């Protein structure tokens, strides 16, 4: 025989509020055997039942309404569960004390005061949440600005090298014009990114399509030829002829290759070697590896180098640099749904690995793009 008193409740909350710890704890308790009442709980979405707000004169949500037994009582704010726990023992005693004339019901004045307190508490909570959101947005915009500024360096450097090569007679005027035109187009695209920083999410700036990573890596190697030939560095590639195309943003993938190969050249010893390998490990991903025989990276630094504003370790030749390029690589790869990591040993060298999704006829609804 069930001797529990029936308690009819209505929980008015938005969908996102139902995932808060307070509301989850409240629902779990009401559905458990620990509750001393026979609970009838109705969960209502205010946008679907706006009449509840007027009917119960709710001034804030989430709100828990005790419909029966009478009188009606309302709890609101971010600590509804703890409020309910304070009142449950009093409701339990109501039946025992009713015949003695003891009134344990909240007065109207107390109820109004409590509602105002809850409203102020909720407004403070909203202000804190808005402040956190604004702070995160500013940080995201600053990070994106640093990335775009870093990317601007690449076409500017390439254009400068082309001008120098033309002066030395290594390329003719038509080739110089072609290079300058292509680099100006890249700068124009980057300037568009800058204009969209305040209104666009990082992943929305990507345009994934079917691309050939082998061709992209070959273009980057040629673009950096002056740097690796000057230091007598040999670059070997191991790319299968049947390597599938991938689904990625061509400009961003080129940036990843530029950053990683440029770093490999920068931190390699003179007359050293760099190897670029691509393998089709599964039907979902292509894995790219870029290895050098440079100074290597200490184990303690290997997890940090992909973070913003981290300085790479110094080589024996005194070369050092900021790791924003690796941060850019990490975010680009992650937006495509892939992974990037490093395997390195001090004095032996470093191998940077990253994965890119295979082209499988993806359309806009099947994109791998995620938040970076």
UniProtKB/Swiss-Prot annotation:
Give the EC number.
2.7.13.3
- Which CDD domains does the entry link to? HATPase, HisKA
Point out residues bearing the modification Phosphohistidine: 150
Q: Which UniProt keywords apply?
A: ATP-binding, Biological rhythms, Kinase, Nucleotide-binding, Phosphoprotein, Transferase, Two-component regulatory system
Pfam families on file: HATPase_c (PF02518), HisKA (PF00512), KaiB (PF07689)
Q: Which reaction does it catalyse?
A: ATP + protein L-histidine = ADP + protein N-phospho-L-histidine
Query: Its function?
Result: Member of the two-component regulatory system SasA/RpaA involved in genome-wide circadian gene expression. One of several clock output pathways. Participates in the Kai clock protein complex, the main circadian regulator in cyanobacteria, via its interaction with KaiC. KaiC enhances the autophosphorylation activity of SasA, which then transfers its phosphate group to RpaA to activate it. In addition to its output function, recruits fold-shifted KaiB (KaiB(fs)) to KaiC to cooperatively form the KaiB(6):KaiC(6) complex (independent of SasA kinase activity).
Domain comment, in the record's words? The N-terminus interacts with KaiC, while the C-terminal histidine kinase domain autophosphorylates and is probably responsible for self-oligomerization. The N-terminal domain stimulates the C-terminus to autophosphorylate.
What name goes with this protein? Adaptive-response sensory kinase SasA
Q: What is the lineage of its organism?
A: Bacteria, Bacillati, Cyanobacteriota, Cyanophyceae, Synechococcales
């Amino acid at each position: 025989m069930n001797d529990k008193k029936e308690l009819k409740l209505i929980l008015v909350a938005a969908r996102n509020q139902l995932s808060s710890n307070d509301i989850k704890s409240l629902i779990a308790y009401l559905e458990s055997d620990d509750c001393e009442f026979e609970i009838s709980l109705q969960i209502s979405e205010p946008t679907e039942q706006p009449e509840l707000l007027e009917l119960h004169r709710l001034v804030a949500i989430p709100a828990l309404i005790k419909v029966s037994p009478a009188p009606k009582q309302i709890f609101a704010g971010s600590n509804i569960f703890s409020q309910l726990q304070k009142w449950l023992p009093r409701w339990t005693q109501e039946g025992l004390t009713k015949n003695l004339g003891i009134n344990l019901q909240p007065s109207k004045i107390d109820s109004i005061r409590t509602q105002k307190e809850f409203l102020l508490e909720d407004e403070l909570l909203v202000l804190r949440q808005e402040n956190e959101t604004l702070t995160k947005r500013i940080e995201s915009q600053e990070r994106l600005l640093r990335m775009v500024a870093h990317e601007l360096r690449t076409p500017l450097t390439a254009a400068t090298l082309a001008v120098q090569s033309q002066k030395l007679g290594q390329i003719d005027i038509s080739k110089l014009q072609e290079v300058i035109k292509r680099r100006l187009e890249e700068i124009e695209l980057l300037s568009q990114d800058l204009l969209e920083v305040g209104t666009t999410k990082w992943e929305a700036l990507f345009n994934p399509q079917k691309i050939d990573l082998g061709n992209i890596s070959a273009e980057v190697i040629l673009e950096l030829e002056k740097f690796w030939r000057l230091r007598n560095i040999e670059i070997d590639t191991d790319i299968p002829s049947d390597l599938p195309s991938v689904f990625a943003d061509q400009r961003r993938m080129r940036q990843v290759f530029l950053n990683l190969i440029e770093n490999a050249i920068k931190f390699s010893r003179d007359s050293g070697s760099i190897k670029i390998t691509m393998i089709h490990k599964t039907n979902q991903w292509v894995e790219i590896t870029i290895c050098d025989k440079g100074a290597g990276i200490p184990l303690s630094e290997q997890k940090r180098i992909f973070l913003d504003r981290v300085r790479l370790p110094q080589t024996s030749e005194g070369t050092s640099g900021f790791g924003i390029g690796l941060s850019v690589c990490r975010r680009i790869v992650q937006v495509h749904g892939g992974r990037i990591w490093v395997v390195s040993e001090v004095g032996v060298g470093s191998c940077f690995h990253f994965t890119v999704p295979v082209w499988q006829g993806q359309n806009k609804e099947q994109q791998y793009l995620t938040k970076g």
